[in-house]
């Protein structure tokens, strides 16, 4: 089934070219189906790129998904035009009285700042509180996951000595968890971050459970017992070239950055990256939508 997106959203042509089923709003109104209402809070600088990555995954499921895009009002985006935001995005005031089946909170390149130093922290706190009462299940990604764990449970983040950068092998910690259905015993996920959340801090909170982790990159998936809040530390949504783009950008600036691990053949950045996380990403988002959004949400929100 398709994702429902606004006419002329830049991601539309890209996804259609990839054979992803996209439906525009006018056609969706003619169908007698209640689509899942999914809100994406996009905190990433390159918003069009992130939109496309997430819509690609949401559109590759049997469920019809009506996507709404949300941006932070208290922060001025320097990498996405005002015209794009005005045309395709809403603010929290626009949606605060609505109910949503699911919500995604993306990462953001602010992890070296203390949470309270982030200029939109107060607004983000209001949105995260809104997710408790107005959203069936919320999926937090990377810094969004760290921020969610800090806001909801007071769990701190810790600065890494060196950036966690590459594609790392992960294993499963739990059996019988619906979010993990169909996962291989070992699978790979990209990470790109300067901070981490410690295992011992999660274990202090009885409501939280560690579903997946990596010997090299640490925690990957943490969730509440009912999976109303899911915290994903990696970037399974990344394009094949996302880590390459980050590496090339930082190298061009003269920054001291290592080649992303397990990404290029023989760690040779002159070669094409090896994509080994795509099937995992599709399964993660499909399981979340099916088991924790679609199966748990009423036909009509009261």
UniProtKB/Swiss-Prot annotation:
Enzyme Commission number(s): 2.3.1.31
Residues that hold substrate according to the record: 163, 192, 249
Site (Important for substrate specificity): 192
Cellular component GO terms held in the UniProt record: cytoplasm
Keyword annotations: Acyltransferase, Amino-acid biosynthesis, Cytoplasm, Methionine biosynthesis, Transferase
CDD domains attached to this UniProt entry: GATase1_HTS
Pathway: Amino-acid biosynthesis; L-methionine biosynthesis via de novo pathway; O-acetyl-L-homoserine from L-homoserine: step 1/1
Catalytic activity reported: L-homoserine + acetyl-CoA = O-acetyl-L-homoserine + CoA
Protease as UniProt keyword: no
Transmembrane in keyword set: no
Active-site residue numbers: 142 (acyl-thioester intermediate), 235 (proton acceptor), 237
Compartments in which it is found: Cytoplasm
Residues the record marks as site: Important for acyl-CoA specificity: 111
Task performed by this protein: Transfers an acetyl group from acetyl-CoA to L-homoserine, forming acetyl-L-homoserine.
Similarity comment text for this entry: Belongs to the MetA family.
Cross-referenced HAMAP family: MetA_acyltransf
Protein's recorded name: Homoserine O-acetyltransferase
